[in-house]
Structure formats: C-alpha cells, structure tokens
Amino acid sequence: MTTQPHNRRRFLQLAGLGTVASLAGTPAAAAQNENTQKNRRQRFELGLASYTLRKFDLDKTLAMTNRVGLKYIAFKDFHLPLDSTPEQIKEVVQKVKDAGLELYGGGVIYMRNERQVNNAFDYAKAAGMKVIIGVPNHDFLPMVNKKVQQYDIKVAIHNHGPTDKVYPTPASAIEKIKDLDPRIGLCIDIGHTQRAAVDPSIPAEKFADRLLDVHIKDVSASSAKGSTVEIGRGVIDIPKFLRTLVKINYAGIVSFEHEKDAGDPLAGLAESVGYVRGVLATI
C-alpha cells in the first residue's frame, strides 16, 4: 500500500518525539510541556456509532464496545427500535448502564414527516439521549426547531456525501439551519465530507459553534467512489482533524463509525481506535 503524504509527515513528527522525550528531564522542558498540555487539552470523548455493529444484537454490541475501551454509544435503531415502548426503552437503557456505558444519542434518525419528528423526540426523551443525530427533511426544520426548544434535546444534522440530495456536506446543512436554534447543529461525518472532496477540518473549524457530534472514519478516495477503510489507511488527514477539534475546544463525542466488514468489524474498529488514541497522545 502506498503511504499517504500526510501519514508520512506524521511519521516524521512522531519520530521527532524521541528528541522531545530526551529533553523532558530539564526544568525548562518540563515547564514548556506543562503549559502546552494546559493550552491544548482534549475536551472531547471517544464513542461508538452503533451502526458499526449493525449485524450484532444488543448484548454483543455492548460487549464489543467495551472490548475496544469506548464508554459512549449512540444507537442506530437496530439496537433500540424507534417503535419501542417506554418499558422496552427503559429496559435497554438499564442494560447499557449495567454494561458501564452511556447512551448519549441516537441516529441516524430520518424525519420525513410530522409523525417521524414527534416520534424521534419522544424516543430520545424516553431514553435520556442528549442528542439526536438526524436527517430532518427541509420542510420539517421549523417543527424540529420547536421540538428542540420544547424538549431541550440537540439535533445534530448528519451529512451523507456527494450523492445525498438533502445534506451532502456540512455547509449545505448550515445553509438551512443558520437562523434556527443553536441546539440544531452538525454531526460532521468526516468520511462523507471527504467523499464530497471537502477537507473535514475546514467545516469543523468554520462551523465550530454548531458542531454537536462527529462520526470519525477514513475513506479510500476523495470522491463518491471512496469507501470506508481502517483509520490511518485512507486519504483523510486524521492528525490534522484531531488537532482542529482540540483547537476549537470541541467538547462533544467523537464516535467511530466503521462501516467496513459488517460481519466481522472488530479488528478494523480496534485498529481505528488505537490509531486515534495514538495520535491524541501526541497532541
């Protein structure tokens, strides 16, 4: 496999850490390192978009999430159906808690009519979710705006790339929601953003005040033909993106959505989590 230029640059940067480490014993270096850590502290947490484990039942999904050391999860309706009763939702939420995880959100949830909008918010409220990762049709954004104000639940609009007619890019979503309640913002899917030939670091910084959630992944090409690969093996400049999140003081969840190998995703997911943690340890 050909090494991507940004990965090669990152390798050289990481290699340079040996020099930094050799100086860490001096008082000046220690003070400088302490100041750097204070100025560039990571405020976000890592989580999982359960679409990654769409071929697995709830119990296996919770167990596999724990195996890769993630503590926050957002459920796709495979794991908590949208038509669940309040009693069923309560039972599932308790299972999540018993597994030592936090169910922070749900999605992607489509809202194409009034019934679906009402159901999405009732579902999220019953589950104690803080955010709906959603795709509301443009005509229903005024209704979503009222629901956000009524329920105090955030809606993070998810972009789906160059073939999506509703929200192909983060910028296309902002154009529709810029005058709405700020609790309606973005879930930037960095893979679909890159597939639209947009560097995901750019909208993350430009729309920082409306960034509510992140789906992190890597893709094989900056075009509609790009598909999910293990993080670090694709074309996205992951170190740059993570540095951007630190720079803008992003304080939400960065959820892994590893779409590759649906029947056997654990190895690729673990590799991706390890790569991201390794990068974060250096910034």
Where are these regions (language model features)?
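Glycine-rich, proline-tolerant flexible connector loops at the mouths of alpha/beta enzymes
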Residues: 74-91
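Active-site acidic/histidine proton-transfer and metal-coordination neighborhood
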Residues: 16, 20-21, 38, 59-62, ...
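Histidine-acidic metal/acid-base catalytic patches
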Residues: 2-45, 55-68, 125, 170-188, ...
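Flexible loop residues that form catalytic
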Residues: 78, 111, 137, 216-219, ...
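Hydrophobic faces of well-ordered beta-strands that scaffold small-molecule active sites
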Residues: 44-49, 73-75, 103-108, 132-134, ...
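Short glycine-rich, flexible loops that bind phosphorylated cofactors or substrates
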Residues: 82, 141, 223
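Residue-level signal for short, function-critical loop segments
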Residues: 52, 161, 260
